[in-house]
């Protein structure tokens, strides 16, 4: 699993995941499933914010390329991936500036358009079960929850999915591809619980149908918001590999 993670994810994401685990005294070489889960969660958070800006009129827009001097503000502030001290500093700054209630737990993102913190979840189980666990832990109506699964399912607070359908489909496609690549290496069953692995086998046909319904359009350009990170999903060689894997999935 460790080799898979280092091959599958952008080195910057791998480095951030390693730092996060070491901060809690965990070893990526031993707790490899957690290592993979953290990398996946980081990538989803970055993909969630990618391309989304607020223009000078306060409107939310999607920009893949354009005038670098345009008066655009990133729609999302990312806390996930920062060390805890810096992340809380960002949260406190947002709360002081906007008047939004400070969350009890460290959130993943802040949405400047909707003026709310967002908790992102990526689950190997049923989305509604994981959603309820998150909601029970957070115990705050102020923090928006958005859960994704590896089978293309999602669930969000009050069915408000924040992003446009194409942006969410890009995330779902990536998660499904990660699952397919794990399965091809015999790693998927160990990534989920034994009970869940059996249930997932029964859902294979349904999952393939979901895969066939997802868009294949993938941008080769790097978002201005993430040029310093150069995320894996915008890397041309990896994008080509993802598309090839995805098209193969469609033909099954």
UniProtKB/Swiss-Prot annotation:
One of its GO terms (molecular function) is RNA binding. Keywords: Decay of host mRNAs by virus, Eukaryotic host gene expression shutoff by virus, Host cytoplasm, Host gene expression shutoff by virus, Host mRNA suppression by virus, Host nucleus, Host-virus interaction. GO terms for biological process: viral RNA genome replication; viral translational frameshifting. Plays a major role in the shutoff of the host protein expression by cleaving mRNAs probably via an endonuclease activity. This host shutoff allows the virus to escape from the host antiviral response. Hijacks host RNA splicing machinery to selectively target host RNAs containing introns for destruction. This may explain the preferential degradation of RNAs that have undergone co- or post-transcriptional processing. It is found in: Host cytoplasm; Host nucleus. It comes from the Viruses. The record marks 202-203, 206 as: Important for efficient shutoff activity. The record marks 195, 198-199 as: Important for efficient shutoff activity and nuclear localization. It comes from Influenza A virus (strain A/Pintail/Alberta/119/1979 H4N6). Belongs to the influenza viruses PA-X family. This is Protein PA-X. Its main location: host cell. The probable endonuclease active site in the N-terminus and the basic amino acid cluster in the C-terminus are important for the shutoff activity. The C-terminus acts as a nuclear localization signal. The C-terminus is recruited to host protein complexes involved in nuclear Pol II RNA processing. The active site is at residues 80, 108. InterPro entries: PA/PA-X, PA/PA-X_sf. The keyword Nucleus does not apply.
């Amino acid at each position: 699993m460790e080799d898979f993670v280092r091959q599958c994810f952008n080195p910057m994401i791998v480095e951030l995941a390693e730092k996060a685990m070491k901060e809690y005294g965990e070893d990526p070489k031993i707790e490899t499933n957690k290592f993979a889960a953290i990398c996946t969660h980081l990538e989803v958070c970055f993909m969630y914010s990618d391309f989304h800006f607020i223009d000078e009129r306060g409107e939310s827009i999607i920009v893949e390329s354009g005038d670098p001097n345009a008066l655009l503000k990133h729609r999302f502030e990312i806390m996930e991936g920062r060390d805890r001290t810096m992340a809380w500093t960002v949260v406190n700054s947002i709360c002081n500036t906007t008047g939004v209630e400070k969350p009890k737990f460290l959130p993943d993102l802040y949405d400047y358009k909707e003026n709310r913190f967002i908790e992102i979840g990526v689950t190997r189980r049923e989305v509604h079960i994981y959603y309820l666990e998150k909601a029970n832990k957070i115990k705050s109506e102020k923090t928006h929850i958005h859960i994704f699964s590896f089978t293309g399912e999602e669930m969000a607070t009050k069915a408000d999915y924040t992003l446009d359908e194409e942006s969410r489909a890009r995330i779902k496609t990536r998660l499904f591809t990660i699952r397919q690549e794990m399965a091809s290496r015999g790693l998927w069953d160990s990534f989920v619980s034994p009970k869940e692995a059996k249930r997932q086998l029964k859902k294979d046909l349904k999952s393939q149908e979901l895969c066939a319904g997802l868009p294949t359009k993938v941008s080769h350009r790097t978002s201005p918001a993430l040029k310093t990170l150069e995320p894996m999903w915008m890397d041309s060689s990896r994008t080509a590999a993802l598309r090839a894997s995805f098209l193969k999935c469609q033909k099954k």
